[in-house]
Amino acid sequence: QGGSDVRANITTAVADDEVPGFTYRLVGHKWFCSAPMCDAFLVLAKSRGGLSCFLMPRVLSDGRHNAMHLARLKDKLGNRSNASAEIELHGALAFLVGEEGRGVRTIVDMVNCTRLDCVTGSAALMRQALVQAVHHARHRHAFGSRLVEQPLMANVLADLALESEAATSLMVRLAGAADQAEGDEQEERLRRIGTAVGKYWVCKRTPPMVAEALECLGGNGYVEESVMPRLLREAPLNSIWEGSGNVNALDVLRAAAKEPGVVDALFGELGQAAGGDRRLDDHVGALRKELDHGTDLEYRARRLVEAMALALQGSLLVRFAPTAVADAFCASRLGGDGGHAFGTLPSGVDCSAVLERAAPGL
């Protein structure tokens, strides 16, 4: 078993006599277990009180291996340096974490941390792909000049650089919210909604961005001697881990409906950039109207979360990035003056300034 419908879990937990109310024996099957070489695992299983969270050690205190059998390692598209296994539990010893029947609520803090990890990893993949593309274009000569000096390639690279900086800016802001969440209600609310927004959008944008960066290297990017194939295989993973795109988009709606203040925290964050760019202001106003229009929210969830992500990225770039970067982002992502593929930035963008910001002197 595995996947997003955690309440469909049929792995069972039976109270053990060793320490009543604390130790349990787990019986069941886990379709996906990431990093099976770890010393301990957080596991959801159904006990008498309902779905509960348990800490399951790999090795017991007396040195014996716990009753956890690795049925096989998964043959994955990418992420091969990190093992994923299918495991069977035959009465494995585990310790109750939190209250019985409140497993999802108990484990959600871990999920929020790993969702931020997914955003961080995807932003890093974007950055590495961008650096490879820019370095190649600055040193590769074709048709009488360096690739980076050719207007269309400069457009492509600058567009990739905008995507990378926007992803990194959002990731850093979410990390800051996570650091400050304890003791700061507004930061906690922003972390709650923003992490799911960032997980959806940054991870979703990584595969096409990495694919475009690979194309900048031509055939050299498609051979295994290059790092690009590995980046491309890795790129889709973070959209799947810790909830696919639909799961995170629906989680944003759930938070907005059930957790008072998260939407206000979002717009409070966006309000700090008010007046900095007309296109951003218009986008934020349209977003508020979309949220107020309460019909078909589930159907429109991806559209809404995309708009939230772009608003957050735009606001951060308007506040903290050079004018050339913020203006290019707002024009191409918020102003309706960009295309669907990378390399469709509108006229007037200072591509040289964007690229020098992204990779000075590379």
Regions found by a protein language model. Give the residues of each.
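Alpha-helix capping/hinge segments and adjacent helical runs
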Residues: R25, R192-F267, D327, G335-L362
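Conserved catalytic-core motifs characterized by acidic clusters
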Residues: A71-L73, L96-M110, H135-P151, L174-L190, ...
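A glycine-rich, basic-preceded beta-loop-alpha segment at the flavin cofactor/substrate interface
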Residues: D62-A67, A71, A83-T114, V131-V148, ...
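C-terminal amphipathic alpha-helical interaction region
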Residues: E259, A265, E269-L362
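A short core secondary-structure module
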Residues: F22-A67
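Flexible, glycine/threonine-enriched loop-and-boundary segments that flank and lead into catalytic domains
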Residues: Q1-A40, E188-K204, P208-E224
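C-terminal helix-coil-helix/basic helical segment that borders enzyme active sites and/or dimer interfaces
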Residues: E165-K199, L214-E215, R288-A301, V305
